[in-house]
Amino acid sequence: MKKIVLTGGGTAGHVTPNIALLPSLKEAGYEVFYIGSYTGIEKTLIEDLGIPYYGISSGKLRRYRSLKNLSDPFRVLHGLFQAKRLMKKIKPDIVFSKGGFVSVPVVLAAGSRHIPVIIHESDMTPGLANKIAMRKATKICCNFPETLKYLPEGKAVLTGSPIRQELLLGNKAAGLDLCNFTTDKPIILVVGGSTGAVHVNDAVRSILPELLKDFQVVHLCGKGKMDDSLNGTPGYVQFEYISEQMRDLFAISSIVISRAGANAICELLALKKPNLLIPLSANASRGDQILNANSFKEHGYSMVLTEEDMNKDTLLAAVRKLYADRHQYIINMEKSEQQDSIDKIMNLIKDNSK
């Protein structure tokens, strides 16, 4: 039986594509191991699935000045030694990395032992972690055609992003029961990402009285970001994070308000869910979500509202227009050619395993 190490973490977007590959990996006869951080969201998500999980030390790679820039390199170095020991212990035939800071020592450790590495880059332009790791990569998968020009020729492969197939199997009755909603009003799903989005959360809450006149709202706020004063509000329910029943929430939703992380928007595309994207601002990120959102807007898959332009009036108007035009967005998404990502990635894994 061949062995594969999966790595990636920090946010759910660096984990869910790995989870999406699990059924196909098991069907192909791979023994799966996961290397992540000690306390990241990946630990909870992977251990809940019964996959052998190994935590290592990791430090954030920053582009800005911070006192932690003095200590984090030592954490990365410690993580590298830990990852090397794990490579020696597990002896994987291949490593698949979804990125995030914890993946860097894992990829470097694999490269030092001449273990094939496949990296997946979901965003339009490579993040810092993948920029460092791609030097050791055998192949680099990407999500957008525009990304190919940023990747080494001969290594880059356009695959799209793997989507958890169970998301396509949502149960409307289960979703309505979870939220205690009815079928009397359409439902808006608000997704701030696994770590939450304070600006999006606050903006949605500011127009909640108006929204609830015409819609029901299910709000995924992020850990520690719920507003207890809103508990019990008719037509509104909030959760920190939902994993297994996410498919049921998608099933009941007419439209979705979301950040523009690459994996999140690819799930919306696969589900053909009309969506309003509010990308993380360039001031708070490297601007990758803005690029992702604009690409989907140009293809007619999404409406986009920037944080800078977002206020009560613009957000409410955007939601109403999105709902009014929802059928056209569905038609546009049905024409998309971004599919079969899992099959493409599995072929790369099989072809490049030792």
From Swiss-Prot:
UniProt-listed Enzyme Commission number(s): 2.4.1.227
Pfam entry (one): Glyco_tran_28_C
Catalytic reaction list: di-trans,octa-cis-undecaprenyl diphospho-N-acetyl-alpha-D-muramoyl-L-alanyl-D-glutamyl-meso-2,6-diaminopimeloyl-D-alanyl-D-alanine + UDP-N-acetyl-alpha-D-glucosamine = di-trans,octa-cis-undecaprenyl diphospho-[N-acetyl-alpha-D-glucosaminyl-(1->4)]-N-acetyl-alpha-D-muramoyl-L-alanyl-D-glutamyl-meso-2,6-diaminopimeloyl-D-alanyl-D-alanine + UDP + H(+)
One Gene Ontology biological process: carbohydrate metabolic process
Subcellular location: Cell membrane
UniProt entry tagged with the keyword Disulfide bond: no
GO terms, molecular function: UDP-N-acetyl-D-glucosamine:N-acetylmuramoyl-L-alanyl-D-glutamyl-meso-2,6-diaminopimelyl-D-alanyl-D-alanine-diphosphoundecaprenol 4-beta-N-acetylglucosaminlytransferase activity; undecaprenyldiphospho-muramoylpentapeptide beta-N-acetylglucosaminyltransferase activity
UniProt pathway annotation: Cell wall biogenesis; peptidoglycan biosynthesis
Binding positions (UDP-N-acetyl-alpha-D-glucosamine): 11-13, 164, 194, 289
Cysteine pairs bridged by disulfides in the record: none
Keyword Metal-binding on entry: no
Main location class: membrane
Family: Belongs to the glycosyltransferase 28 family. MurG subfamily.
The protein, known as: UDP-N-acetylglucosamine--N-acetylmuramyl-(pentapeptide) pyrophosphoryl-undecaprenol N-acetylglucosamine transferase
Species in which this protein is naturally found: Lachnospira eligens (strain ATCC 27750 / DSM 3376 / VPI C15-48 / C15-B4) (Eubacterium eligens)
Gene: murG
